[in-house]
Every structure is written in C-alpha cells, then in structure tokens.
Amino acid sequence: MNFIDEVKICIKGGNGGNGCVSFHREKFIDRGGPDGGDGGRGGSVIFRSNHHLNTLVNYRYKQHFTAENGENGKGSNRSGKSGKSLALDVPIGTQIFSEDGNILLHDFTEDDQSFEIIKGGSGGLGNSHFKTSVNQAPRKRTEGEIAEEMWIHLSLKLLSDVGLVGLPNAGKSTFLSVVTAAKPKIADYPFTTLVPNLGVVYVDDEEFVIADIPGLIEGAHQGHGLGDKFLKHIERCNVLIHLIDGSSNDVMADYNTVRLELESYSDYLKNKIEIICLNKCDVLTDEEIQEKINELQKATNKEVFPISTYTNLGVNKIVKLALKTIKNQE
C-alpha cells in the first residue's frame, strides 16, 4: 500500500431541503389551510480517527466529498428527511489544516475521536409557518440553507514513543527488525527505507511504539534527500535513538550532520532526549570502539552505547533504557 501523508481535499455539507407550499385538501372541504412541511436538514461532514488506518491513501485519487442533502418538505405538514452525514475516517495522528496550511483545525491524537468540521444546511420552512390572520392561504416558503464548502489540508504525523534517526545505512531498519516484528526492507545501500516504518517493542509486560524514518543527509531540512519529508513523523515521540555507523571514518561528522538537521527542522526535535548508539561494533576492535565512544562522549557530554544489530550486542539494554525514559516523562 502506498504511504501517503499529505493530501488536499474539498468537503461540502449537505444542503437543507426546501420548504413546501401545500394546502389541506379533503372531501367536502373547499379551502383547507396551509400544510406545507419543512425541508430536512442537510448532512454534516465528520472526521473520525481509526486505528486500523496508517495512511491517507484513501484521499489520494478522490478529492471531493459531499454529505447528503436534506429532502424537500411535503404536504400534510410532513417534513423532509434529513440528509445522512458523511463520516470520513483518517489515521490517528492526522491533523486538519486550512487550505493554506496555516490554521490547525483539529489534531487526532487518540482512536475513535470525532470532529464535525461542517454542519449541514438548515431546512427551509413550509408555508404553514406563514399563515396569519390576514393571510389564511400563504404561498410563501423558504429554501433550504446552502451548506458550507471548503478545501482543507490533511497532514499525517505518525504517533510513536521512540524515533530512530541516523544517516543512511546507519542500521536503523535492521535495529527495528531486531527489536520488533516489523519487516522493513533492508539492504546495504543508502535510502533502503523510503517511507516511515512503525514497530511495537515488547519489554516484559510493557510495550512502546518505535518509528524508523528514511536516513537523513546534509541539507535534509531544506529538502535534500528524503528525510525532511518525514521528520514530522518523529516530532511527537518522547525520545530519539540516534544510531551512528561505527564503521564510518568520521563518526563525529556523522553525528553532527544528523544533529544539525534535527535542530534546523524544529525546536521540538532539537530538545528531545537522545540516546546515542555506536552501531556495527561487531566489525570493530575493542580499541576502535573505545576510541570512537570517547570521541563522541567528549564532544556531546552524553553517554554513548556500543551496540551491534548483527550480534545483538547491547540492543536489549537500549530497549530497556528507552522504555525507562518514556515512563519517566509520563
């Protein structure tokens, strides 16, 4: 299934039905009074969050959505039937913006939330409302209200507890596959991950959700590579796991490249708790591991953890540390 996280669609409420002009007709009664019924209310447009969805692909090929119109009023004071409301399901994490993207209208952060974005138009009044002492047979009625129509921008930000970051080929997808049941595409070339991947990590009787986004490169926040499009998907997480390729000739430069992109993208990412991991330690000697860890710790003033997703060295420790960090922020 295609991963779609940005769409623009046009939505419209149902118009109200028109009021009816009608007069009571019965045998032996020549001039019955007005009995025109009211028009039915138009249907509303409602968005609902649905945990079974993880993409906005349903809105990629269809852009226009309209609720049902209310029926016109009828004789014998019968009101028209109200139009059915239109319910549009979106993934948890979807944000609804104005067409220009500047005004946030709603943010779905939990399952089964509802948001009525457009109300249906009111039904018109039948002629029975306009009978007066001087006008016993009014032919007046009102038309139903025309419902609002608008273009909106839907943006999906995945909800996860932990975000995986690093340069391409830092081993993020392998890490995800080792600690979860997720099956991301893995190969030894850059940009294997083309879309965000989510997985659930189980630790004893507890669990958390981890997100792997495409690798970052220098200039990602300006649109280079793939990362900038997906950085928003880790804005909501509690902690970042920053993987660094231990086989790199310059681990400090690799670290700084990713940090610059995070800090340039938003303060949300800049200030998140970071767990730094030196990955691929299985291909390094003990002396090389210690040398690179010392270099990183001296520059960052943070603890750096040696791991290997190939041998599982240190992976379980990182998972438990991530869970502890998440719980400390709750």
Curated annotation (Swiss-Prot):
List of residues binding GTP: 166-173, 191-195, 212-215, 279-282, 308-310
Residue ranges occupied by any Obg domain in the UniProt entry: 1-159
Primary location group: cytoplasm
Compartments where found: Cytoplasm
BP-aspect Gene Ontology terms: ribosome biogenesis
One GO cellular component, as annotated: cytoplasm
Cited SUPFAM superfamilies: Obg GTP-binding protein N-terminal domain (SSF82051), P-loop containing nucleoside triphosphate hydrolases (SSF52540)
Keyword Cytoplasm in annotation: yes
Enzyme Commission (EC) number: 3.6.5.-
Binding site for Mg(2+): 173, 193
Names of required cofactors: Mg(2+)
MF (Gene Ontology): GTP binding; GTPase activity; magnesium ion binding
Domain OBG-type G: 160-327
Alphabetical list of InterPro entries matching this protein: G_OBG (IPR031167), GTP-bd (IPR006073), GTP-bd_Obg/CgtA (IPR014100), GTP1-OBG_CS (IPR006074), GTP1_OBG_dom (IPR006169), GTP1_OBG_dom_sf (IPR036726), OBG_GTPase (IPR045086), P-loop_NTPase (IPR027417)
Keywords carried by this UniProt record: Cytoplasm, GTP-binding, Hydrolase, Magnesium, Metal-binding, Nucleotide-binding
Domain of life where this protein originates: Bacteria
NCBIfam families: Obg_CgtA, PRK12297.1, PRK12299.1
Function noted in UniProt: An essential GTPase which binds GTP, GDP and possibly (p)ppGpp with moderate affinity, with high nucleotide exchange rates and a fairly low GTP hydrolysis rate. Plays a role in control of the cell cycle, stress response, ribosome biogenesis and in those bacteria that undergo differentiation, in morphogenesis control.
Subunit annotation: Monomer.
HAMAP family to which the protein is assigned, alphabetical: GTPase_Obg
Family per record: Belongs to the TRAFAC class OBG-HflX-like GTPase superfamily. OBG GTPase family.
Protein name: GTPase Obg
Gene coding for it: obg
